[in-house]
Amino acid sequence: MNQIDAIEMAQMKKNIPKFIPGDTIKVQVKIVEGDKSRIQAFQGVCLGRQNGGIRESFTVRKISNGVGVERVFPLHSPSIEAIEVVTRGQVRRAKLYYLRKLRGKASRIKERKYVAGQ
């Protein structure tokens, strides 16, 4: 292992849940305003994951007051406090950019069902 890999491994978070595009996730983001800090939740559908390793990021989309809002989060950012998987979605694509054009019930994602023991 070279020095760059060792530094990257030390900076990577260990407590990240497994999630894939289509999952509804809640991201707890630390926001610092002046000398105060607070935690803000951003809940939406994961549209995709990009890159890998320390540079990995993911895109989350939600509808807020009838307007679509997308946010790209670096996966290993220190400003992310926690990531929670709310529901697991069943999709057949790695990038769900087609959801940007859909409105209302058409933009719903089928929920993935699990069999005990898997």
Curated annotation (Swiss-Prot):
GO cellular component: cytosolic large ribosomal subunit
InterPro entries per the UniProt record, alphabetical: Ribosomal_bL19, Ribosomal_bL19_CS, Ribosomal_bL19_sf, Translation_prot_SH3-like_sf
Keywords carried by this UniProt record: Ribonucleoprotein, Ribosomal protein
Keyword Transit peptide: no
PROSITE patterns xrefs: RIBOSOMAL_L19
GO BP terms: translation
GO function terms (MF aspect): structural constituent of ribosome
The keyword Ribosomal protein belongs to this UniProt entry's keyword annotation: yes
Domain of life: Bacteria
Family annotation (NCBIfam families): rplS_bact (TIGR01024)
Role according to the record: This protein is located at the 30S-50S ribosomal subunit interface and may play a role in the structure and function of the aminoacyl-tRNA binding site.
Family designation: Belongs to the bacterial ribosomal protein bL19 family.
Record PANTHER family: LARGE RIBOSOMAL SUBUNIT PROTEIN BL19M (PTHR15680:SF9), RIBOSOMAL PROTEIN L19 (PTHR15680)
The protein's name: Large ribosomal subunit protein bL19
